Regions:
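A conserved beta-strand-loop-helix scaffold within acyl/acetyltransferase catalytic domains
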Residues: 1-15, 51-206, 301-302
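A short, structure-level motif marking secondary-structure boundaries and short turns
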Residues: 88-89, 144-145, 202-204, 221-223, ...
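Active-site/acyl-donor-binding loops of N-acyltransferases
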Residues: 2-12, 65-84, 228-288, 292-295, ...
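Polar/charged alpha-helical tracts
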Residues: 31-40, 124-127, 158, 162-166, ...
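A broadly tuned preference for mixed-charge, low-complexity surface segments
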Residues: 53, 94-109, 133, 170-175, ...
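Acyl-donor binding region in acyl/amide transferases
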Residues: 4-72, 190-248, 254-255
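Intrinsic-disorder/low-complexity, polar/charged segments
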Residues: 28-31, 84, 122, 258-260
Length: 302
């Protein structure tokens, strides 16, 4: 397990630590699991990702003799796929529904009359998906600047193929004039599709490819009536809050032994993140943050 130290867009370090991680979907995690994981692993550091909490937790506190460290807290957005497509659409305003229809129609017109999007879920198909999605991902600023694109290594491809054999993966691609312009990758566990990677080519942003692909995928999933949830993964953002009409407030909770090494790790992390936040706030006050983002994207694209 690693805890990345980031300053703005840059990852400064990723200390790797061995620890016991609770392996449960966030929808099944309860407060008592903190006690249970400590009982099961009394001599190990422990981590509970996306633990639902009723209110924000202090970043550092004590819990059962451990150093409880909470680096991230966020709304985790999701969609209940059992409610039906009509009911889901009804949770959007009439203005938003009309906007979605316009976006789909605009992309269809640019594509010659129909939107060309495809689903991949077989061992052979998922390899084709990966190859084409990597072509898109490699050109996005998220990958070139943030190293946050679809992984390209052999081990990841082998994992995709294994998941496809077990029926536990979906890949989606959106095409324009025969060329991929957007992708969505979703692993599947316990009947839950997880939004893992979404990317699109910035030069086609006027066609809203990421939004259109997400909308069409969700429509198909509702009609398929096979899965329980679409989980937008940890973290927040406009895309997730637009589509994920339900959410739970969650925290990543580290239960660490109170050693000097763990204390140094925690307080170093806090120092870096606080300094990064101060720098971001200063740029915002000076109205330079948007300009800095545009320059960073241009540098990545150049």
């Amino acid at each position: 397990m690693y805890l990345p130290f980031r300053f703005g867009y840059r990852t400064l370090a990723e200390p790797v630590r061995t620890m016991q991680v609770l392996q449960l979907p966030f929808t099944r995690i309860r407060a008592e699991h903190a006690e249970e994981i400590l009982t099961a692993a009394p001599d190990e550091d422990c981590l509970i990702r996306s633990m639902p909490v009723e209110a924000p937790l202090p970043r550092v506190s004590r819990f059962r003799g451990r150093l409880r460290f909470v680096p991230r807290q966020y709304q985790r957005h999701f969609i209940d796929l059992t409610t039906g497509w009509d009911a889901y659409q009804g949770r959007f305003s009439a203005k938003t529904r009309a906007s979605m229809r316009r976006k789909v129609r605009k992309l269809a017109e640019a594509s010659g009359g129909a939107v060309d999007w495809r689903q991949y879920d077989t061992p052979e198909g998922i390899q084709e998906f990966h190859q084409l999605a990597r072509e898109v991902s490699a050109r996005t600023y998220q990958e070139r600047l943030l190293d946050a694109g679809l992984p390209g290594g052999k081990a990841f491809v082998e994992q995709l193929v294994e998941r496809a054999r077990e029926g536990r993966v979906r890949g989606y691609l959106l095409f324009l004039q025969g060329q991929p312009i957007a992708y969505l990758y979703c692993p599947i566990d316990d009947g839950i599709l997880r939004y893992a990677f979404l990317g699109y080519l910035q030069e086609h942003a006027d066609l809203s490819p990421g939004t259109v692909l997400q909308w069409l995928v969700l429509e198909a999933l509702f009609h398929e009536e096979r899965f329980a949830l679409f989980d937008f993964s940890p973290g927040e953002g406009a895309h997730k809050s637009l589509f994920g009409k339900d959410s739970r407030y969650c925290a990543d909770v580290y239960l660490l032994r109170p050693s000097w090494r763990n204390r140094a790790l925690v307080y170093s992390y806090l120092a870096v993140t606080d300094l990064s936040r101060l720098a971001s706030d200063a740029l915002s006050r000076l109205q330079l943050k948007g300009r800095a983002k545009r320059r960073a994207r241009a540098a990545a694209a150049g």
